[in-house]
């Protein structure tokens, strides 16, 4: 009976989103800090702080990796021109409307 109660109470918690988003590129994270979205350079950003952002302008910030952009689920406009990343996967950004990723070294865009 205790095991059943435990499962009923904690099983729904497995579906909750992660509280932090992994952002391995220090320049990307620093750009988020400069925008007031993050506070500490530690490779993690609070997901609840980025999941409502609709516009993101991170041009000329020497960013080589945009890992973490997938958790910007409300993002409509992204300007990330003049950086140095080679891949950009925006397949998890369902409402994205406008992207400017010019002057990068893109070999893959999704």
Where do the PLM segments sit?
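Consensus positions within tandem repeat domains that build extended binding/scaffold surfaces
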Residues: 97-103
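N-terminal capping/linker segments that flank leucine-rich repeat
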Residues: 5-79, 88, 94
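Short, intrinsically disordered, charge-balanced linker/junction segments flanking boundaries
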Residues: 107-110
